[in-house]
């Protein structure tokens, strides 16, 4: 039963681009995307604060669901829509502070054991990955594939879920067919020959999410 310890999110979050700059946040919001994540890696809080502030302001202007990856203190300070954390970040994060601030929480998982850990935290949504091989980041685990993804989605049938990892435009329909509520994409948009067209096509497949 979906009873998160954090504010809920729509069951279907739709197309969910993960990008590393405010410029991409603004472009994608302007293109009609309504769920997205700012993921800037390996910088100190003070180095990314201006970008976090700008991204949150854009998210508010477009009435979008903007998640901040990892920088949970800044997300709380500037009242982001939500925070996304990897498994390795859960132990080092003050989840009570995120909850008290009224922010949504998304958590990454890579197998059944990590899903158990995520469920214990009762987040707003659970990300399932990586579905396919990915060049975006180094992954210690093997790709799950569509069958494993479908099994996880079935297990979490009443929970908002996000598929991530190596999802291209060509693979997106098969991923959505598993019943997952959202697809997170990175290079499918940022490395596309025509990012506007790729975004429009992915929105056609995954939607903008439920209100």
From Swiss-Prot:
Keywords, in A-Z order: Magnesium, Metal-binding, Thiamine biosynthesis, Transferase
GO molecular function, one term: thiamine-phosphate diphosphorylase activity
EC number: 2.5.1.3
Record field: catalytic activity: 2-[(2R,5Z)-2-carboxy-4-methylthiazol-5(2H)-ylidene]ethyl phosphate + 4-amino-2-methyl-5-(diphosphooxymethyl)pyrimidine + 2 H(+) = thiamine phosphate + CO2 + diphosphate; 2-(2-carboxy-4-methylthiazol-5-yl)ethyl phosphate + 4-amino-2-methyl-5-(diphosphooxymethyl)pyrimidine + 2 H(+) = thiamine phosphate + CO2 + diphosphate; 4-methyl-5-(2-phosphooxyethyl)-thiazole + 4-amino-2-methyl-5-(diphosphooxymethyl)pyrimidine + H(+) = thiamine phosphate + diphosphate
Taxonomic superkingdom: Bacteria
Record note on cofactor: Binds 1 Mg(2+) ion per subunit.
InterPro entries according to UniProt: Aldolase_TIM, ThiamineP_synth_sf, ThiamineP_synth_TenI, TMP_synthase
SUPFAM superfamilies documented for this protein: Thiamin phosphate synthase (SSF51391)
Pathway linked to the protein: Cofactor biosynthesis; thiamine diphosphate biosynthesis; thiamine phosphate from 4-amino-2-methyl-5-diphosphomethylpyrimidine and 4-methyl-5-(2-phosphoethyl)-thiazole: step 1/1
Gene3D superfamilies: Aldolase class I
Keyword Magnesium: yes
Binding site for 2-[(2R,5Z)-2-carboxy-4-methylthiazol-5(2H)-ylidene]ethyl phosphate: 134-136, 166, 186-187
Cofactor(s), names only, from the UniProt record: Mg(2+)
Residues binding 4-amino-2-methyl-5-(diphosphooxymethyl)pyrimidine: 37-41, 69, 108, 137
GO biological process: thiamine biosynthetic process; thiamine diphosphate biosynthetic process
EC primary class: transferase
One matching Pfam family: TMP-TENI
An annotated GO cellular component: cytoplasm
Chain's role: Condenses 4-methyl-5-(beta-hydroxyethyl)thiazole monophosphate (THZ-P) and 2-methyl-4-amino-5-hydroxymethyl pyrimidine pyrophosphate (HMP-PP) to form thiamine monophosphate (TMP).
Protein name, per record: Thiamine-phosphate synthase
């Amino acid at each position: 039963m979906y009873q998160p310890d954090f504010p809920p999110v729509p069951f279907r979050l739709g197309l969910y681009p993960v990008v590393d700059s405010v410029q991409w946040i603004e472009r994608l919001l302007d293109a009609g995307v309504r769920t997205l994540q700012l993921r800037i890696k390996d910088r100190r809080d003070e180095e990314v604060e201006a970008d976090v502030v700008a991204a949150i302001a854009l998210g508010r202007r477009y009435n979008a669901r903007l998640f901040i990856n990892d920088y949970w203190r800044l997300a709380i300070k500037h009242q982001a829509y939500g925070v996304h954390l990897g498994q390795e970040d859960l132990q080092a994060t003050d989840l009570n502070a995120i909850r008290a601030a009224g922010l949504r929480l998304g958590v990454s998982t890579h197998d059944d054991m990590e899903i158990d850990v995520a469920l214990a935290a009762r987040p707003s949504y659970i990300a399932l990955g990586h579905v396919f091989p990915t060049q975006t980041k180094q992954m210690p685990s093997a790709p799950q594939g569509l069958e494993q993804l479908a099994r996880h989605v079935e297990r979490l049938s009443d929970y908002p879920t996000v598929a991530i990892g190596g999802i291209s435009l060509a693979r997106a329909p098969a991923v959505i067919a598993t019943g997952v509520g959202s697809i997170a994409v990175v290079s499918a948009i940022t490395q596309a020959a025509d990012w506007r067209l790729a975004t429009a096509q992915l929105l056609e497949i995954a939607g903008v999410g439920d209100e």
